[in-house]
């Protein structure tokens, strides 16, 4: 039915927690939700982003490949002497998970243009799937520039950006962070659906569910 790709302005901006929020939101609306992490680096089998999403939401996800070192996937694969990912194979696997009343939530690695393999990025995956993007950004000093660059890079590739989610929002934001929240929609031209509090990954399923209700995620996208 629908596939959406969650990417970020950088690594460690809160993509996994935001992906969990998106999964929780559509699951509560009655959709069958399938979280997908095409590639995980730096985590042993049984741990990683898919497992974090499962812990927060109870929804079991898919991870297609793992490379040992916490690097860009192409570099981690190279250094381990492992075969790199294949774009067509990844796209076909994701398409196979789609179906009636299904929302497939694909979480990228790092930022929009991080190399999943030498020959492609998560932007290329989204383009092949004709899937829109959700961009996760922090709100600290410098985030306006990073968010605008990410949105611009996506749009120049013909990708639709549905919305922004702020990740790892501190309990007591400083002046720059507070102002950036107010300015984010203006500089990017993309709606900010809300921000996820710092430490949300440690919440119980019940508390995380309440947090998701405070976000302004859309019922469904056109």
From Swiss-Prot:
* Domain of life per record: Bacteria
Q: Where is the active site?
A: 37
- Listed cofactors: Mg(2+)
Broad class of the protein's primary localization: cytoplasm
Task: Fetch the InterPro entries from UniProt.
Answer: DTB_synth_BioD (IPR004472), P-loop_NTPase (IPR027417)
This molecule's function is given as: Catalyzes a mechanistically unusual reaction, the ATP-dependent insertion of CO2 between the N7 and N8 nitrogen atoms of 7,8-diaminopelargonic acid (DAPA, also called 7,8-diammoniononanoate) to form a ureido ring.
- Name the family: Belongs to the dethiobiotin synthetase family.
Q: What is this protein called?
A: ATP-dependent dethiobiotin synthetase BioD
Q: Which organism is it from?
A: Corynebacterium diphtheriae (strain ATCC 700971 / NCTC 13129 / Biotype gravis)
Its organism's taxonomic lineage begins at: Bacteria, Bacillati, Actinomycetota, Actinomycetes, Mycobacteriales
Gene assigned in the entry: bioD
């Amino acid at each position: 039915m629908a596939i959406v790709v969650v990417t970020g302005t950088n690594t460690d901006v809160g993509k996994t927690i935001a992906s969990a929020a998106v999964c929780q939101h559509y699951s509560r609306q009655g959709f069958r939700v399938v979280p997908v992490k095409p590639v995980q680096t730096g985590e042993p089998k049984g741990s990683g982003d898919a497992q974090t999403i499962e812990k927060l939401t109870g929804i079991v996800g898919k991870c297609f490949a793992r490379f040992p070192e916490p690097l860009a996937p192409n570099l981690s694969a190279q250094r381990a002497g492992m075969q790199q990912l294949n774009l067509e194979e990844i796209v076909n696997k994701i398409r196979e998970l789609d179906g009636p009343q299904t929302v497939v939530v694909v979480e990228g690695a790092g930022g929009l243009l991080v190399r999943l393999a030498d020959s492609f990025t998560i932007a290329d995956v989204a383009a092949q799937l004709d899937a829109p993007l959700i961009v996760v950004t922090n709100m600290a000093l410098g985030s306006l520039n990073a968010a605008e660059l990410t949105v611009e890079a996506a749009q120049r590739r013909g990708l639709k950006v549905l919305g922004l989610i702020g990740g790892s929002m501190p309990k007591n934001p400083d002046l720059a962070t507070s102002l950036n929240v107010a300015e984010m929609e203006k500089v990017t031209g993309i709606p900010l659906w809300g921000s996820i509090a710092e430490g949300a990954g440690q919440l119980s399923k019940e508390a995380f569910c309440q947090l998701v209700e405070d976000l302004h995620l859309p019922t469904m996208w056109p």
